[in-house]
Structure formats: structure tokens, C-alpha cells
Amino acid sequence: MKELKDHVVVITYGPSSEASVTASPVSQQTPSLFAYSVTPSASRFSSRRASVHVIGLVLRFITMVLCFVSALSLAVNVQRPSKRHLTQNSSSFASYPELLYCFGVAVIGFVYTSLQTFKGVCDITHRGVLISEPLSDYISFIFDQVICYLLVSSSSVAIAWIQHINEDAIKTLRNNSIVSVSMSFSAFLVLTLSGLLSGYKLCKRFMW
């Protein structure tokens, strides 16, 4: 009677163990096929994000150079006027609020884009050590809009000043102001593209 029980136990547990052995290869194949199917799409997504990051970095570098040239074209004409010749027709841009505003905005744009360029290079080399990606997307989108507004407003103010100034005594300053406004408006156009790219990255973050 005892041997019959042992024999019955062997018969009942034998098929279940065999079934578990045959079922295990099927369960192991499913994740491997899924993993191979996901890898190409993930690599394409990461390469697309890397290309967007590089394009944004190039746009900010171009904006930085344009803002630097805009500020430099006004700064090279600085002369320290004497107290006796401190009149309205001074050849220094600091004597005119419109040009001083344009110079200040160009300096602000240069500092901002320099920091963004430095951060972009650090993100490529050190994989986002300075600021996290979500916070960086928000900061870039907001400050791109602010700097764009400042650039276009300073260009408009400087253009109005150039149109009303015809004195020969400040002809050099007027020519330098034209160069500064041209560079400032070009920086506005390039930074607008960078702002659109920042908005695209922010929308993609909301979608994902």
C-alpha cells in the first residue's frame, strides 16, 4: 500500500514538472524578441535628440557672435568727452539713451548665449552635469523669448535714432550704429529659430 502511494505521487508530479520545463523556453523567447524590436527605434530617437541639441548649440553660438559684434561696433567709438565739449552732439554712444539701450541689450544677449553655449558643450561632454534637462528646457524657452523681445525693441529704438540724426559731427557713430543694429536684428532672427527649437523640445517633453 505504501509503494502504491509512492508510485501515484511520481505519476502526478511527473507531467507537471515536464510541463514546466517545456513552458520555460516559450516564456524566455518573448522578452528577447521585444528587446530586439525596441532597440532600433530607441537609437533613432536618441540620435534625433542629439541632432536637435547640436542645432540649438550652433544657433546659440551664432547669436553670441552677433551680439558681440553689435556691442563692439558701438564700444570702439567711445571717446571720453571733456567738460567743455559735453554737448548733445557728442560722438560717444553713452550720451544717447537709445544707443546705450542697444549696447546694454547686446551685452545681455552675449552673456546669456555664452552661458547657454557653455552649458551645451558641457551637456555633450559630461551628459548634463550642470542643470537637469527638464529645468533647462523651461529656462531656455522663457529666456529665449525675453532676449528676443529685448533685441527687437532695442533695434527699433536705434533705427528711430538713426533716421533722425544727420549731423556730420557724429557720422562715424551713425555708421557704427547701423552696423550694431544690423547685427542686433540678425541676432534676433537667429535666436528666434533657437526659441522655436526650445518650444519644440518642450512640447516633445509634454507629449512623452
Swiss-Prot record:
Disulfide bonds: none
Assigned GO CC terms: plasma membrane
Keyword Transmembrane helix: yes
UniProt topology in membrane: Multi-pass membrane protein
Sugar-bearing residue positions: 89, 175
Record's keyword terms, sorted: Cell membrane, Glycoprotein, Membrane, Transmembrane, Transmembrane helix
Segments on the Cytoplasmic side according to the record's topology features: 1-53, 114-141, 198-208
Transmembrane segments: 54-74, 93-113, 142-162, 177-197
UniProt cross-references to InterPro entries, sorted A to Z: CASP_dom (IPR006702)
Side of membrane Extracellular, spans: 75-92, 163-176
Domain of life: Eukaryota
Subcellular locations according to the entry: Cell membrane
Subunit record text: Homodimer and heterodimers.
Protein name: CASP-like protein 4A4
Protein's organism: Arabidopsis thaliana
